[in-house]
Swiss-Prot record:
This is Secreted triacylglycerol lipase LIP3. The keyword Signal applies. It comes from the Eukaryota. Its main location: secreted. It is found in: Secreted; Secreted, Cell wall.
Length: 453
C-alpha cells in the first residue's frame, strides 16, 4: 500500500535515470533449494533456524554493509497448528551496535514469491522499483549502526494483508535473528520496528501480537505509518480507483489463510474473479496496480452477489479479526508511534485513528501524529514521516523514556531536509527527497492525471 501517486511515476524514472541496479541471475524463491526446509522441520520450535547463508545485497545499501545473511526459520500461519517456514534477510553495517535490532517491514504489497525482500534486495531494485523507498528508509538505520532484519512475512501462501500471519512470522524472524550466533548480536538486544503502509500492517500486528506470542522479546518501540488498520474500510475506499489492485492482493491474502472465507468465495466469485485473483499471486505491486486500475470488484462480473460478499458474516468475521484494536487481548505492550496523512487516499485516516483510540482505551502507550497539511497524501507521508519515525525509534533504542499514555500531535511538514540528520545521512535522505519530487499536489493528483492519459 505504499505508493502515493506522485511517487509511483517518479520512482520508476529514478531507478532508471540513476542506474541503481545491477541485476544478478538469481533463481526465484520457488526454484531456490535454500527455501526448502530439511526433513523434520515441523517438529522444531517456532523461530528455530533451519538454514543460513551469506548473501550479497544488490542495492545502494551494499556500501553501508559489513555483511548480509539470510535465515530460513520455522514459523506458523494464524495458529500454532499451522507450521510453515519463511526467510529473513539480515543486514549488518560496519559499525554495528550489538545491543540493538531493527525489524524493517518492507512494503512488498504482493503475494508472488519474487516480490519478497529476500529476493528483491538481492536481485536489484528494478525487480521492484518501488523498493527505492524501502532502501532509503533502511539506510537510515544502517547508517546509525543498527542491525536490520527483514522477514518475508507472507509465507508460502502469499498472505498479504493477513495481519496475524504477518505478525507471527515477523516475531519468529526476530527470534531467529537474535539466536543467530554469527553476527555478534546480544540475545537480549533492544528491538524496534519500522513499517509504512503494507509494512504498517506488518509492524502494527507485530506490536499487537508480541505480548501473547513472543513475550520474551525485548521490544522497546514500534513505528507504524499510513497503516491500513481496517480491511473493510480500505476496500470501500479504494475499490474502483487507481489503487484497486490492493483489493485483489488483499482478498487473495485473506482467502489463502482463512479456509472458511475461501469456501464462501469459491461459491460466489465468478470464473473471471478466480482468474483475477491469480494475478497478484504471480506479479509484484506495480504490475498489480496497473493491471487493476479502476477495477470495480463489486461488479457482477466479479461477484455474483455484488458488494454483498464483503459483508457476508463469514467474511466479516475474518475481517474483524484483521482490524487492529478490536480485540483487547492484542494490545501493544510496548510504546507505539503512529503516523497518518489526513488526505491519505489509500489507507483511511479515520480507521487508523480508531485503532489509536482502541489501543489507548485498552492501556497502550501510543503517540498519534496527524500529517495535517492538505497535501499529505499516502505517498507524500511515506517520505515525510520517515525522519520522525527514525528519530523516535532511535530514542527508544538509546533508552530514552516516552511520555506515558496517549497523545495526538499535528505535523504540517510536506518536505524532507536532506541535512536534517547531518552529513552521514545525506545520501539516504537525499534519495527520499528526490522521490518526493519538486511538486506536490493535493491527493497526489499528478499521477492520477498521468494514469488517465
Amino acid at each position: 500500500m505504499k505508493l502515493g501517486i506522485v511517487a509511483f511515476t517518479l520512482i520508476s524514472f529514478a531507478a532508471q535515470a540513476l542506474a541503481l541496479v545491477a541485476r544478478e541471475n538469481l533463481p526465484k524463491p520457488q526454484n531456490d533449494p535454500f527455501y526448502q526446509p530439511p526433513d523434520g522441520w515441523e517438529s522444531k520450535k517456532v523461530g528455530t533456524i533451519l538454514r543460513s547463508r551469506k548473501v550479497n545485497i544488490n542495492t545502494l545499501v551494499k556500501d553501508n554493509l559489513k555483511e548480509a545473511w539470510q535465515l530460513l526459520y520455522r514459523t506458523t500461519y494464524r495458529s500454532d497448528d499451522e507450521p510453515t517456514t519463511t526467510v529473513t534477510t539480515i543486514m549488518v553495517p560496519h559499525n554495528a551496535q550489538n545491543d540493538s535490532l531493527v525489524l524493517y517491514a518492507d512494503f512488498e504489497d504482493a503475494g508472488a514469491p519474487q516480490c519478497a525482500p529476500s529476493y528483491t534486495w538481492r536481485a536489484g531494485l528494478l525487480s521492484d522499483t518501488s523498493s527505492i523507498f524501502n532502501v532509503g528508509i533502511a539506510m537510515l538505520y544502517l547508517q546509525e549502526g543498527y542491525i536490520v532484519t527483514m522477514p518475508d512475512k507472507e509465507g508460502n501462501k502469499g498472505a498479504f494483508g493477513s495481519g496475524h500471519v504477518e505478525g507471527r512470522q515477523s516475531l519468529d524472524g526476530i527470534r531467529a535473528t537474535l539466536a543467530f550466533d554469527k553476527i555478534g548480536l546480544n540475545k537480549n538486544a533492544r528491538v524496534v520496528g519500522h513499517g509504512y503502509s503494507g509494512g504498517g500492517i506488518q509492524c502494527g500486528w507485530t506490536a499487537a501480537l508480541k505480548k501473547s506470542y513472543a513475550p520474551e522479546i525485548n521490544s522497546v518501540g514500534w513505528f507504524t505509518g499510513g497503516t491500513p488498520s481496517n480491511v473493510t474500510a480500505l476496500v470501500e475506499k479504494i475499490n474502483g480507483g487507481p489503487f484497486a489492485g490492493y483489493v485483489a492482493g488483499g482478498l487473495g491474502g485473506v482467502i489463502s489463510t482463512y479456509p472458511d472465507v475461501k469456501a464462501y468465495t469459491d461459491k460466489v466469485f465468478t470464473k473471471q474473479a478466480q482468474k483475477d485473483l491469480e494475478f497478484p499471486r504471480k506479479h509484484c505491486q506495480e504490475e498489480i496496480t496497473l493491471h487493476f486500475l479502476f477495477k470495480n470488484f463489486y461488479d457482477k462480473s466479479f461477484s455474483t452477489v455484488g458488494k454483498r460478499f464483503l459483508y457476508e458474516p463469514v467474511v466479516q468475521k475474518a475481517l474483524n479479526e484483521l482490524t487492529m484494536g478490536t480485540n483487547p487481548d492484542f494490545t501493544p505492550d510496548t510504546p507505539v508511534l503512529m503516523a497518518h496523512g489526513v488526505s491519505d487516499e489509500v489507507a483511511p485516516y479515520e480507521a487508523a485513528h480508531e485503532t489509536y483510540k482502541s489501543w489507548c482505551k485498552n492501556g497502550a502507550d501510543v503517540e498519534f501524529v496527524s500529517f495535517a497539511n492538505p497535501v499529505s497524501a499516502h505517498g507524500v507521508t511515506t517520505v515525510t514521516s520517515t525522519v520522525p519515525g527514525f528519530l523516535w525509534n532511535r530514542d527508544r533504542l538509546q533508552g530514552k523514556p516516552v511520555q506515558g499514555g496517549c497523545r495526538e500531535i499535528k505535523n504540517y511538514d510536506v518536505g524532507v531536509n536532506s541535512h536534517a540528520l547531518g552529513e552521514d545521512f545525506e545520501s539516504a535522505l537525499g534519495l527520499l527527497k528526490g522521490l518526493l519530487g519538486d511538486k506536490i499536489g493535493p491527493n497526489d493528483e499528478y499521477l492520477k492525471d498521468a494514469l488517465h492519459k
